[in-house]
From Swiss-Prot:
It comes from the Eukaryota. This is C2 domain-containing protein. It is found in: Membrane. GO terms for cellular component: membrane. It comes from Toxoplasma gondii. The keyword Coiled coil applies. Residues 1-54, 355-377, 398-428, 1192-1267, 1405-1424, 1431-1654, 1666-1747, 1822-1841, 1879-1910 are annotated as: Disordered. It is a peripheral membrane protein.
Amino acid sequence: MMKLKEMVEAAEAKVESKPPQAAEEKAPDQAAGGAEEDVAAAPAEGGEGAEPLDQAEIEKMLFDESLGAQEYTYEEFLDLIDQPPEERGEAEDERKHWSYPRRWKVVLWNLQIQNYMDDNFSAFMEFEFGGTREECKVHKGTSVLIYATGQDKNYLRTPVIPDVSNAGPVDMHFRKAFEYRGSYLDLEREKLKIKVWEYRNWTLNHLEAVYEEALLNLATGETHVERDLYKFIKGRRSRRCRISFHLYFQELYDFELSFVKWRLVQIMPCLTLQEKIANRGKNKGGYTREATIGFKRHQLADQAKYVFQQRQVKREMQKRDSQRELLPGASRPEMLGGFADKGSARLSHLGFESAMKLPNRGTRSPSGLESNRPEDGNRNMEEIFLQHQATILASDQLEELPASLRPPLSKRRKGEDKKDGNKADGPQVKMTISLMHASSMNKGLGLVSSERPADGIPRWDNLGEIYFRGTLRDLDSTYIQVVVEDTTAPKVMRQIGYGQIPLRGVVDYSCLSTELGTPMWLALQAKMEGWGHELKEWCFGFVEGTVMVAHLPRYRQLGEVSESDSDRVYLILRIKDVDQIVTPDNRPVVDSYVEVSFDGTSRRTRTVRNTLNPVWDDEVTIPLRLPAFRDITESDVTRKGKVWLDVWGTGPGYVDHLGGCSFSLYEIFFNEKHNKRNLTAMQRIDLEANTRQSYETRVFSTSRRLAFIHKADRPSTIQFEAWTCPDILEVSGIDKLPEPERITTTSNFPRALRNTYERLKRMYAEVIEKKGLVNPDTGVGPPRFFDVEFLDQRKETHYAPTMVTRIRPPFGVDSESSVFHYCRCVPFAVKRENLVFTPEFAVQIRSGNAMDHSILMTSLLLGLPAFAFVCVGTLWDKHMHAWVATFHYDDDRACGVVKFWETTTGLVYTLKHRFRDPYTLQRLSADPEFGILKMMNIQRRKRLSILGVSVDADTPDYISRSGEDLVQSEFPTGGAKLPYRSLDIMFNNRNVWLNIQDGNPAKVWFDIWDVEQWYQFSPGLHDVPPCFIVRGFGAKVAEWQFDRAAQEIQGKVLSDITAFRATRNLPTKWNRDDVLDAFLQMGLELLHQAATARDEDFQLARLKLEDWKKAFYSKVPCSYRVRGAPLHFNTYDSKTISDAIIANVDFVESRDRSAFFSLAVMLYNLPGELVSTYVYICVTQKVTERERRRILAQKEKQSREDAQRKARKQRRKAGHEGADNGAEDKQGAEGNEEEHGDAAAAAVAEESVSAEAVQGAEEPKKVVKKGAVPRVKKRSYEQVEGTEVAAIAIERDFFTEAEAPDFKNLMTDVEHAINTHLGLSPGRVRAFQARYAEKRIVFAVGPPMDDATEADAVSSVALMEKLRDILPSMAHEEGRFQEVTGGGATLQWDGPGTNILDRIAQEQATAGEGEQQTSEGIPTRDMQVDGTAVLEEAGEKSDKKKKKKEKKEKKEKKEKKEKKEKKEKKKKKGGETAAEPEEASAVLAPPPVPAPAAAIPSVLLPTDSEDGEKEKPKEKKKEKKEKKKKKDGETDAEPDEASAVLAPPPVPVPAAAIPSILLPADGEDGEEEKPKEKKTEKKKEKHTEKKHKKKSETLPESETTAVVTVTPGEEDETSPLVPVPSSIASSEAPEPPASTRVTPAPEPKAKPGLSMGAALLAVRARSRLQRKHLAQQLSSSSSSEVSASSASSLSPSSSSSSDFAETRAKADALRARLQAAQARLAAARETEVSSSETESSETSEASFLSSDGEWDALWQSQRAAAMERQQRLQKMVSGVKAAYRRLEEENTRLAATRRRDDKLQRQVEAERERAVELLKEATRRAKEEKDLIARQPPPARDWSDTVVLSTPQIFVNSQAACAPFADSGRDEGERDEWYEVSDACSRRAESSNESRTTAGAKLRQQQLDLAGRT
């Protein structure tokens, strides 16, 4: 055989490459299994297009059985014979699986041959099916022998067909059925060999062609086999003929069918059926008996059966009545009526009553509907319900109540007699399952269940097993018959339901369900009584269950087998052709087939490949679920619906719907004139009996135009024929069928809903209008989507709940996450038309948009079951969108949870606390399947209560509790940031709910049972059937194809990435280690488990995935890093996956030459030929130093952000108690310290983790730049007319953070958040300032554009007002805006036309003036409290320098004014002495705005007053002398400085008596100096710096402490900010000379009080006070109350003079000791070596300090206390600043409120004035009219002078007048306040009827008189 193949290839190589003839086709590729190529020989037309072969080659190509035989030597042939048979598998069970001999059923029929040559020949064929016979050429010596090995199994031969021409296919009249035996390995070894022979008379037959193919290809291929046979003649390979046949080749298998989890839903017991029969309507809206049925009058069998049935029923009931021992006078109808009454009473707990009485509520005025205010919403709903009460009550019918809501029948009480013989208290049901239409070996198989109570839902967890023997085709064609019986009913009437369920596809989708049909006895009774058409609207319940198939055959044959059984009815269609295929993307060729769907099942034709003009000529057979022939009724036929034909196109990686059409069964039996069609003779084949049978039937032949789901201009037409086998009209006796009704939206609705559907739609539209849901000024605004009808793929309009139904998920999809994953595996597509696909169509076409995925997912979730809904709304771009919502009850938090499942992105949004009444949700979620009905009943009861319908007080607990204990909150808060702009409606398979709350889904309460929040479209509890039939999900992708796809993906991705990098001159290295591949695949498997895990298993799956990540990263070498990308795809197309990886994975283009790539692929096979593909690609590369630093910096930044976010969450969780108690600075400081501590700890932890992320990396030095955040960051903006500028006050303090945020991103985030929540387009909002120090973000909202949309057309003022309301909730929503604001934000806006920048500038100006006067009450420079100095930070110093430069210009301008003012004051007061106290009092005055830092009584007092103190000439001379002394003797100054540093604090003074007085350290807060004085000051500073450098060599570590050094000889202008005693601070005194200064003696212990610097300052102030005569200054300033009070509060103590003397003496002693110490230190320094200078100085210093132990202890304690006070002061300062800012904001807010209130007050006053003007105008007009009437002539005296005013009533005449206050609820006898009006005087009218009659007569007489006069 191999030699033959080589010969053929050599011959083809010699053929010249010329275009082939039209009649020639290329030979198909040979299949696997060693089959040889088809060869044939025939003379073509002249042999054109081929080169003649050599004669020697032609002689070798003998067409006999030895053609292509293998050649062996004799020894090789012997070895071939002795070779043992092949085995496969390692374990014994696996070897047995492959080599076990099996039975296969083979049927070959419909064999045809078509001649492609011009010559006619008589043909016959031989088939060798299986066998191992093989011919071999054996070289034995010089001869060549032909030997045959193996054996034949099945040999078939057809009859001879004469004169086979090329006119068309010729039937060979051959049909054969037999059994083949062989193992799975035999299918691979053995072949089917077909030989085509030409029959010749009087000579040998001629072999025309030979065909071979492995049996495995036939066992896995299609049933329709079509092959072309070729042969060589005259050197040309031409097509000889084509053979086609049907081959049924499937394994006989023993299937174990397990029936588990079966139940009955909404069944009606026998008594309920009898009650419904008794109460049924008489021919309501139906056809009459004669018009619909038209029975043959000679059908006596049915009449006899009916009479016998009624007799049996009567006899059974009489027997039961006698057993019950009825009371005298009690008859059966009365008992039945009593049962009905009791049943109605039991239904009353749900609010259903057969007769509902409405109280006389009177008529409501429709004017109440015109109000659109929110507070009138409930009133509007009540008015709408009252107006449409007839519609609501008409659609709410008791007779259509789903049986699932019916209450259980009353059970027998204890003590009641059981003589009736019943085994149970209530109705008991049982179910019988049997196989129908099965093969002869399976007939009689069935199961009978045990009895269950009929109340509720009868369930059977395990019914048993049935062992079915047959092929997969036999199992698919089998139906199971389900009969439900009520064992307590009479024997004749026990059957209460009947159904047939096809087992087609049960091996792939094990869930079965069907609607129960009419019982046989009821169908017979309705047929004989003439109301059979009414049964179409009756629902007898549903049966559901699961059939598990334990084991399956390995191989499965594709295609259909057209076979009919004589005991059932079939619908047969012969699909001919389609004139032209129109594809959506204009494909040149396509593989197509036709699928026929009818009666809950579908069949398909064979696939015609590579053509746009397919010709099938194939028959499709569909079994019909009908009872026995004579039991078929008219309703059984009409309720079947339409027959649909769909043309599908398939190819590698795509499925297209190429059009569809439909017809009805009525068209098969009747023509266009409604006459019966003629009978036509047809034939059918019985494969089991291998016979052909003839029958007569009516044939419908037509052509229909296909309807497309895509837009197409070209038409496409399909031709087909249809008939039934046998003819239904003949076997059932039905003479006439009703004409098919036009399919509408309400065709399958229950009667009550169908009759009121249009009115319900009008009511729905009215609710939308009255609620103002489409009003652009309220709520979210348009566009909104409230449609309750959708257009499906067949261009039919359907009610939204009919698009959803309960679908049991396929096996393995058993959780909400797995359902979500399965739906996302359906590819997404963009539709050209607005069509909605049904779930089964979306799975079949394997594509859809968000709406299709949401409907599919909701249907699957309902089948779990779950509380699921389809949500329809809009995205932020205002496009329509759909997603899925599920309701859950959280037992831990005792709250309701809503989950939004976004199918497009794969994200799940969880919203907690979204139910005001979680208790009701808890009760309803316990039964998700039927809890929705109970929830609808709650809403129904509320609606009926509005209508005034009496409801029984015995209400279930879950209904009575609804509405109680509600969470009184306007909107829910918190939750994830949603991508949805509005939520408009929700629907599932039960109803549609309209959202009448706020449109934003984040602000919606999901208590859909509350009529005030959700409007229910359909008031009744109707069970609406779906508009489609659930047919399962189909098979999975074949295993061999699946395995090959995985290998193709991996190879394609490797080659494409390598080629892609090669185009960029980059090398690619792949790590193909087996261990690594297995480990990566394990990670993908864990990822899939986490994506599909149940809620209770999710944490475990996530933990396993985290452990895998840690193990993976732990194997990374040092100084290397790994970057990976896990990707998911819903296809196995290798090109699509490869292109997506290259486009989306950035590190594919990595230029690092040390990079190694790794790849892993994992595929999951899902039902419906869906695939879930996971790909993980990673790269390992060496990390450079620059890259390492960048990575660490990014991780450090991320760690800081995480720490800050964590701290903010902790603050929000703990509350804002510090903000409420702002005056308590100590608590605020502690809180700030804790926050910084948490942030620092988190940052350190994250930093350590980041350092470990890169192996072998060194930790970089952490440099934190203080003061990096500016106070204000700005950018430009354009302010036009109509722009509103405002600010957002945030809680986050950016100014205190280490790094400044990205200003551009910050502004973009703010703009995006405002635009998103206001629904504005980008560019309308402009954020342009970030005032970090003030915690404000300034933005502007521009005016609307001319061509703006409806949402953008809103004015800026309205947007600001709306933003004021929603801004706090925006800050609470998780997202970027929450991070920016810190969880809290308020709007600062002063009203229309204002600019917040003006307000900010005013605040800054006010703050600047207060700073000059009071320094804001907060110290901002180096300050000293209790001897401890607080040094300002570097960032503050830099800011101070900038401020100094900015303020210099302002100060110079003020300087001139101040000088003039000082001169004027001197002239007025007569001298400097009189002016000084006033200046001091002005400085000591409290600030205008009270600061919250009351606990820190800091009062600013400059050493030299800000107004400038003019000293006397004598004093100036003294100062000059002191300066000279400084220059002459530095040794005298140094001890003074040392004493100032080392001096202990003086005698402690109580803090309450001596508050700290802060003195400014420089000219910024003190006196402004002259230019000359500044120069001298700079010289002094340089001089002191030099002295400090010298002292640093001699002094110990005193300068590292926070103690301020005071130089005794310095001027007051340059003295630092220090606290002074209050006794000295109230007045100014001249500085004492240096000789008078006394240093106090050291104390043994450190005590709180004034430091040494304060003591020296006190001495200096004391001497100045003495020289300036303190008594005279105080007496001169006694007139000022403020200064007097200040002086009294700061008065010195009585013992101050003695303390000063002691201090001076101690200072002198200390100065002497310091001089001696300096001398010793200088000597020691000279003796030390230069290399150990520092060491010797420390030793000498230590010896000096150790010379006095008390000094050392005192110094250490003083240093520790100073540091502690410094830290405490910093905290206090920050607290004071924060409190001051809060007070400023509060004052600003109060001012804005006052301005707004004033504006409103002005508006009210204006309205009041306008109303007064209108009142005056009305009074004037009334007076004019009255004068005009007075000027008319008076009437005659006999006229009546009274007119009666009454309330409006309904009268026959027109005497009633309209009163201003109408009361329609009063009766005629209850009228009051009637008055008679006569000559502008009124009095009470008489209420008697006589006075009314008299008044009426007078009025009529007046009218007559007036008529006569005119």
